[in-house]
């Protein structure tokens, strides 16, 4: 692996483990056992490192959100949401310290806001399809409210679990998916609710 890539992957690891504000370029170079000058040759500042890693997150998230599953099978939506939560966990430092990070990096703040809007659009597309197919018994106002709650839960789920448990366990992603779908459950038809119960038994 090239030194530049090693710097990025080690930085992501340290950001996730320690939190972005607690990671310096000196720490990154020490962890990689390279000189600060070598790191500086590839990246002039931590901001450059953070911006590139955010670009990874951004590209991966957009790939997921550009093509949400439009079918009416609740299991398909379960796995789609699981992929979203996996992406959030992979770059969890962004979500764990989201207010602090976004306040200090204006460019990233604007890009993250666009991702939030895209999450909402994807949620609306899925719910609207379920609504049109008769699987979701909700009016347009309820669908709009559900979209807000879905994005809110997905965005802050890891923070909630860290605060309540002190650590992230292996089943935290499936729990997050279930919490999101549970928001929709009261509006699902009987068949979809039964399938949701089966998924809960299988994955939680």
Where are these regions (language model features)?
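Hydrophobic alpha-helical connector segments
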Residues: 66-93
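Helix-turn-helix
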Residues: 6, 14-48, 52
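Secondary-structure edge/capping motif, primarily at the C-terminal ends of alpha-helices
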Residues: 65-69, 95-102, 130, 134, ...
